[in-house]
């Protein structure tokens, strides 16, 4: 997300980066909206969606959350945990797909197996224009790496495979694809991050 925000800002986009906790420094000129939970991220993105041209959901949002979060750290001796009940978090990307009008929507899929099959299924289910998929178990790819190897899938069923590249270069390739979308389905200035771009 940070590489995308930097690349979009360098192209002249007005970028809002909605980010969970990280040690990364926001790119210069990018507005940061920090969040800590999936619900906070949902509220931040949904509240700004109407004035956005392009939304790129690059964050790996947790699929589940504890049903009853503890107010403080649980001590093993005082209250041993024998089970943990989980509830599904809201599907932010699907909600954006249902709400959108002319916005461009780009999703990400971090997979560990059957990469393209799962990515194509997610692209259709979420209603996005592009889906960026990567195998997070592959060497040099995924979280905590400065490089990534991805597929970029579109709604016509095409899947472009990118070689292992620096994440900033991957970000530029993704933005290049955004600019190939038909007028009216994209902004002339793409935005990025798990974030938004204000309409002018």
Language-model segment annotations:
Residues 22, 112, 157:
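Short, glycine/serine-rich, charged loops/turns that create anion-binding
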Residues 14-16, 31-32, 53-55, 103-107, ...:
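Structural motif
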Residues 22, 45, 49-53, 178, ...:
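Structural signal for hydrophobic packing residues in well-ordered secondary-structure cores
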């Amino acid at each position: 997300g940070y590489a995308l925000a930097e690349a979009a800002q360098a192209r002249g986009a007005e970028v809002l980066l909605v980010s969970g906790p990280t040690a990364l420094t926001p790119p210069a000129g990018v507005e940061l909206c920090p969040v800590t939970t999936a619900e906070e991220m949902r509220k931040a993105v949904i509240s700004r969606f109407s004035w956005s041209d392009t939304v790129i959901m690059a964050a790996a949002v947790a699929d589940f959350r504890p049903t009853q979060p503890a107010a403080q750290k649980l001590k093993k001796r005082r209250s041993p945990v024998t089970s943990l009940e989980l509830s599904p978090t809201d599907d932010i990307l699907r909600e954006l797909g249902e709400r959108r009008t002319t916005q461009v929507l780009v999703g990400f899929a971090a997979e560990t197996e059957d990469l393209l099959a799962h990515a194509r299924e997610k692209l259709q289910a979420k209603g996005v224009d592009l889906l960026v998929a990567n195998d997070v178990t592959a060497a040099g790819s995924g979280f905590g790496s400065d490089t990534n190897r991805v597929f970029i899938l579109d709604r016509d069923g095409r899947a472009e495979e990118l070689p292992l590249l620096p994440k900033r270069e991957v970000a530029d390739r993704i933005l290049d694809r955004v600019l190939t979308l038909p007028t009216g389905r994209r902004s002339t200035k793409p935005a990025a991050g798990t974030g938004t771009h204000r309409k002018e």
